[in-house]
Amino acid sequence: MTQSLQVKLLDPRFGDLWPLPAYATEASAGMDLRAALEAPMTLEPGDAALIPSGIAIHLDDPQVCAVILPRSGLGHRHGIVLGNGTGLIDADYQGPLLISTWNRGREAFTIEPGDRIAQLVILPIVRVSLQVVDTFVDSARGAGGFGHTGVR
């Protein structure tokens, strides 16, 4: 199933130098977001920066949200991850998408203009109403917390 997504191009390099965000394969869950930088940016170990994506989106459907996630290769190979873990974009937000980028690695890393540095995933939302209770019906796990189910 494909739905439309309103996108505003905030950087004129889209269309000429850079393609619009798109799914890389038929089964891709996310679309890559680019670093809409004017010049290369070097992140020293421990540094964080807000990097513009060059686009704004408007989901306009309260039953979906967007999340910005790291690209696995950048995180695994270079320690480049999102400074906020995951970026959550509400359906009524219309501003520019900024990517909180953090170098948790041991070496400086340079991001070039147009580099694909994160991915955008659209997800369904289930809204709930809270029901205050005194006790829960027993479950197999109960209140077992971190490590409760073991490693093996």
UniProtKB/Swiss-Prot annotation:
It comes from Xanthomonas campestris pv. campestris (strain ATCC 33913 / DSM 3586 / NCPPB 528 / LMG 568 / P 25). It is an enzyme of class 3 (hydrolase). NCBIfam families: dut, PRK00601.1. The gene is dut. This is Deoxyuridine 5'-triphosphate nucleotidohydrolase. Its EC number is 3.6.1.23. Disulfide bonds: none annotated. InterPro entries: dUTPase, dUTPase-like, dUTPase-like_sf, dUTPase_trimeric. Keywords: Hydrolase, Magnesium, Metal-binding, Nucleotide metabolism. It catalyses: dUTP + H2O = dUMP + diphosphate + H(+). GO terms for molecular function: dUTP diphosphatase activity; magnesium ion binding. Signal peptide: none annotated. Gene3D superfamilies: 2.70.40.10. Pfam families: dUTPase. Substrate binds at residues 71-73, 84, 88-90. Its cofactor is Mg(2+). This enzyme is involved in nucleotide metabolism: it produces dUMP, the immediate precursor of thymidine nucleotides and it decreases the intracellular concentration of dUTP so that uracil cannot be incorporated into DNA. GO terms for biological process: dUMP biosynthetic process; dUTP catabolic process. Pathway: Pyrimidine metabolism; dUMP biosynthesis; dUMP from dCTP (dUTP route): step 2/2. Belongs to the dUTPase family.
